[in-house]
């Protein structure tokens, strides 16, 4: 866990893994602001969270959301089948080609011709932050729909050779004037050296309870949270605010407006 005070208003809290985030939630007592207040992480309805209880959300977090994982595998296969990796020509010696290598020909070496072979381009490592900043009026089904888009985009980029770090982020703000506070929570759910594990990612990336139970629990336990967050858990940070915090990285906003089928390169991630 790393914390950084960006300014008097904004504090960024980063977790290097889902396990580190979970351990913090489970082992940290309720903060002073929420100690005697209602805990939305517990009382949230099934229609709002898609789970019956906090315990059910934790179980899905630990064991995986198998129903959605099966659905996602099929969707991602379609995405992968329509995506071709970026290729570049590479010279190689061959028995036939466009130019003879005379010394090799004289020596009787069979591979005495210069030819070209198309090989995948090794792409750079990029970091993508998926915003889970949905307000209370956003339906749980809409959260699922938008979050699936994020997984499809990452799959397309990796099929082209990009290596993606993937984070989920929550930015929440409450208070006014000098008392205004903003907390930006960033959780690494996939490292660039990992292949996409749909079973592992289905719950934290797609399930509404990741926001409405587990991230709510973070607000309930993090010591610096003030009483202004009680009740509504703050209001979502704007995408422009998150982009400033994560300069040099890519942001997938809560609502992706572009057609996912038209997002093919990292250049297409601008203003999605």
Pin down the residues of each PLM region.
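Internal, hydrophobic cores of structured domains that mediate oligomerization or house catalytic pockets
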Residues: 95-169
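Acidic, glycine-rich A-domain
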Residues: 1-62, 123, 134-139, 148, ...
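Negatively charged sequence features
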Residues: 43-125
